[in-house]
Amino acid sequence: MSMNVAWLSPGAAYADVWEAMKAFTASRGPATPDEIWLCEHAPVYTLGQAGLPQHVLNPADIAVVRSDRGGQVTYHGPGQIVVYCLFDLRRAGMYVRDYVALLEETAIAVLGRAGIVAQRKPGAPGVYVEQPGQTLAKIAALGIKIRKGCAYHGLSLNVAMDLTPFHGINPCGYEGLQTTDMASCGLSCSVHEVGQALADELVRRLSAYQGSLSSGE
């Protein structure tokens, strides 16, 4: 399958990337190759379409941007990889629920190969790691938008970041939800390494999905 993978400038402004995703999606045609954009954002809180302002508790000097993605509120910043997936789901023959599962399973697979056991949580999209006391902390978040069968936005995974800004919100709309990163799980790796691993895994899984459809499995 044809897939363009691009790294955006470090500290890319969320609003600029969002506008670029919308423009790409609006202009793409039936044969336009899918793309993956990888980046670390400058600090920003984003509110999804279902986002309630009361879940932004104390933004301090961090900007809050209302977005068209699904979900509630989250934080993006340095030390976190954001993977924007500009995929034609209609062309791939993929239902939204299967796409969400693909994103979650991609993060779980990459974390697993790094030695971190992660899991999905029923009713709460994203990827979680068990903490002492058997509580779950969120390590990866999802947010997607589908327009005319094409997806944009994607997933974020906390690599080695300052987690303090998550205390200024109810992450994903859940009061008291803990967050963690790969560094807190004892793993030292770069955002670039993790981003490339996620992109490679996404391409592999999307290709496998399309292959299973064409073979009638």
UniProtKB/Swiss-Prot annotation:
GO terms for biological process: protein modification process. The active site is at residue 172. The keyword Oxidoreductase does not apply. Substrate binds at residues 69-76, 141-143, 154-156. PROSITE patterns: BPL_LPL_CATALYTIC, LIPB. The record marks 138 as: Lowers pKa of active site Cys. Pathway: Protein modification; protein lipoylation via endogenous pathway; protein N(6)-(lipoyl)lysine from octanoyl-[acyl-carrier-protein]: step 1/2. GO terms for molecular function: lipoyl(octanoyl) transferase activity. Residues 30-210 form the BPL/LPL catalytic domain. Catalyzes the transfer of endogenously produced octanoic acid from octanoyl-acyl-carrier-protein onto the lipoyl domains of lipoate-dependent enzymes. Lipoyl-ACP can also act as a substrate although octanoyl-ACP is likely to be the physiological substrate. PANTHER family: LIPOYLTRANSFERASE 2, MITOCHONDRIAL-RELATED (PTHR10993:SF7), OCTANOYLTRANSFERASE (PTHR10993). This is Octanoyltransferase. The lineage of its organism: Bacteria, Pseudomonadati, Pseudomonadota, Betaproteobacteria, Burkholderiales. The gene is lipB.
